[in-house]
From Swiss-Prot:
Organism, scientific name: Entamoeba dispar (strain ATCC PRA-260 / SAW760)
Residues engaged in binding Mn(2+) 2: 155, 292, 383
Region feature (Disordered): 1-29
A single GO molecular function term of this UniProt record: RNA ligase (ATP) activity
GO biological process, one term: tRNA splicing, via endonucleolytic cleavage and ligation
Protein's name according to its UniProt entry: RNA-splicing ligase RtcB homolog 1
GO cellular component terms, semicolon-separated: nucleus; tRNA-splicing ligase complex
Amino acid sequence: MAKSRYSRKNKGKKLQRVQENTVSTEEKSVPEVETIDFNGFQIPKVYDGKLERKPMELEIKKGFVEGMNGDAKIFCNDDLFNLLTFEMIKDISNNYPSCVRQTANAATLPGVVASLAMPDAHSGYGFSIGGVVAMRLDNSEAVICPGGVGFDINCGVRLIRTNLQREDIEQHKSRLADELFKQIPSGVGTKAQIAFSPEDFDSIMTEGLEFLVKNGYAWEEDLSHCEEHGKIANADPSLVSKSAKSRGYKQVGTLGSGNHYLEVQVVDEIMDVEAAKAMGINEVGQVCIMVHCGSRGLGHQVCQDYIDLCMKSGICNPIDKQLTGVPFNSPIGQQYYSAMNCCANFAFANRGMITYRIRQAFETVLRMKPKKMDMHLVYDVCHNIAKVEEHEVDNKKVQCIVHRKGATRAFPPQHPDISEDYKEIGQPAIIGGSMGTCSYVLVGTQEGMKKSFGSTCHGAGRKMSRVKAMDNLTSKDVINRIKEMGIELRITDPKLAAEEADEAYKDVTEVVETCQAAGISKIVLRLKPLIVIKG
């Protein structure tokens, strides 16, 4: 019997996932599992013949789990595939829901035409985080799954450019970090500096970023550089519970905690000059600001409310109860879709209000108007969302409900749903790294529309749970290392810094390069942090 091998480079090193909310992250010992050689790696013998390795892809054959409607796929290079092999061994030995199994499980859902995972994918609640699952809507059984969107509905990221150079802010870095930390509340349960009335909050859930434009908190031009123009239709606040609203209405303009962040960054390298120029980014050293956050307590409560409702309905009983959903066109399906859109609109407004505060902070410290500093929005993208989109399936254009959970929409040049400013280059996809590491801007490709339903990665992706990170790293060491890099760090709870250390994540450069090699997106530029604000 062959013994399992975790890595060509790091034999025997244990890797650990992070789970969402209710899923345990307890580290367990891995009993010996009978394995076979698979392209130079060891995988469980029970998967013999059920996987196929292709360039930058792992194909999961129909039959990997019972009831699959077709093959499933994970985009990965050899090093990223190596992380998946250990998960698969734990899956067999400890009934561990690996990313591979979760991607296969999602392929059993009614109406599914694609179950994919991006290179940054890891196990999550039901769907893997990094998953893209599409169902064709001409199938009346096609489902929508709250767990397939996740608890942080429209967690997303936006990038703001400036005409400033690094030297323009270098001497102001500490004060600018302090001002941003003061202006933008961060951490668990934080409340906004501006409290909207319940009536206004309903308007925010309906209008999204438009509400901020009407009330002077956002610029008109921000709308065209935001996915869905910052407002998703079919959003009925009456379908959002009172408890969900009570968790959200005082949180417009707050960062939250966990992996959410605000970074002042500098352009480190430009790979595609023309695409960068279309985004208003013209040279290395240019200062930008990246914001990563979502729908806060509102989204979490809406997700939980509708997971509970779906489980009680008994309409859909999948292979994994965490995948429970309902037919998209059923009453409950449409209610969840509308409530989800309310949360998405809130998240657009949340990032918009944070942008308002960022512009104020820069004006306070640098004594220049935001317009003079060219503080325009490059783009704002969703990471956790389900959307109705047109895609080609079996050589026919059909309407699909596409779940993206920890994945970024990345539509190609000339796609009708992207801004006129980006028609020639494709939709920007903003990809954040782990704390203290670089981030990237990508654009979508025509090949990506065919291979990944117009989707790409969303970040680095965890390889170590929060519990494991806290056990193996000290927050003091993590903070000191970031300071030694010349980065100004402000963090609400310093004790939790180890959870977000770069060792807990995959290499974001490897992730985006895999996406490019797979043809699903193209790298435009790289940024590195000067200031990091964390919850």
